[in-house]
């Protein structure tokens, strides 16, 4: 209501994992529910050609985007009161992406970013979704961060090199994974909460992973500062 939303885009798999069927049924009385599975089925040949040729000929398919216009409305986690809707422009998000790129050395031909964090939070959206697209990095999305064993196995099978996480989640993944499951990771970018010394020691000793800890806020798109690796 605060963002004047009229449509909700989701996926049946996400609804199933979260046992959100009753909520979706209630919301469907006020909003149009769009399932990504249905969108995929309705893609025309023209849509598929545009999607395939777009990366090769970007200037032919690029839509003009006013950078000052609203790009996204994200709601804060509510740690200091009721959640607030934060309006971010395209320029806000893209500027923060470039700032992060200037701080983290990325290798498009080698790096694989693993993002289990939700994109309805700014960290998961800016760093976990927009950044790898702009940087040309292969990205693996996982529908929920609450599956430590499955995530550890999937990191191994995809040979991911960068993990997005929080202190709580990366310590769970390190403990839940078998020896060697996280060995492909060279870096974990952590935010949302302070990284404890014991977490750094755990992942460094068990998996030889360096943690890049960031500080930020949704209003800042979200990264404000980050430590240097090493």
Language-model regions, residue ranges each:
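Gly/Ser/Thr-rich phosphate-binding loop
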Residues: 49, 160-165, 174-230
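Short acidic loop-to-helix transition motifs that present clustered carboxylates
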Residues: 1, 145-150, 170-171, 195-196, ...
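Short, structured coil segments at secondary-structure junctions
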Residues: 3-4, 26-29, 135, 183-184, ...
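Conserved structural elements of the adenylate-forming
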Residues: 51-58, 67, 86-106, 116, ...
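Conserved AMP-binding/adenylation subdomain of ANL enzymes
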Residues: 94-112, 120-162, 176
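Structural core segment of the AMP-binding/adenylate-forming
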Residues: 1-48, 159, 166
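Short beta-strand->loop structural element characteristic of the AMP-binding/adenylate-forming
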Residues: 1-9, 32-36, 85-87, 115, ...
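Conserved pre-ATP/AMP-binding loop-to-beta segment of ANL
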Residues: 33-75, 82, 105-112
């Amino acid at each position: 209501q605060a963002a004047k939303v009229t449509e909700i885009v989701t996926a049946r798999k996400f609804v199933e994992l979260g046992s959100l069927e009753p909520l979706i049924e209630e919301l469907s009385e006020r909003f149009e529910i769009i399932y990504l599975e249905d969108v995929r089925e309705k893609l025309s040949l023209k849509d598929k050609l545009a999607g395939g040729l777009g990366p090769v000929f970007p200037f032919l398919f690029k839509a003009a985007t006013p950078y000052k216009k609203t790009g996204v409305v994200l709601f804060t986690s509510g740690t200091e009161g009721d959640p607030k809707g934060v309006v971010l422009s395209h320029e806000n998000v893209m500027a923060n992406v470039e700032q992060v790129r200037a701080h983290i050395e990325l290798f498009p031909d080698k790096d694989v970013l693993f993002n289990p964090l939700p994109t309805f939070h700014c960290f998961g959206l800016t760093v976990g979704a927009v950044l790898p697209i702009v940087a040309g990095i292969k990205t693996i999305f996982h529908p929920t961060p609450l599956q430590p064993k499955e995530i550890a196995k999937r990191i191994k099978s995809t040979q991911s090199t960068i993990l997005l996480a929080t202190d709580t989640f990366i310590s769970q993944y390190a403990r839940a994974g078998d020896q060697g499951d996280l060995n492909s990771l060279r870096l974990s970018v952590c935010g949302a909460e302070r990284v404890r010394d014991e977490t750094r020691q755990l992942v460094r000793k068990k998996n030889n992973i360096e943690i890049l800890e960031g500080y930020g806020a949704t209003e800042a798109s979200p990264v404000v500062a980050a430590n240097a690796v090493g």
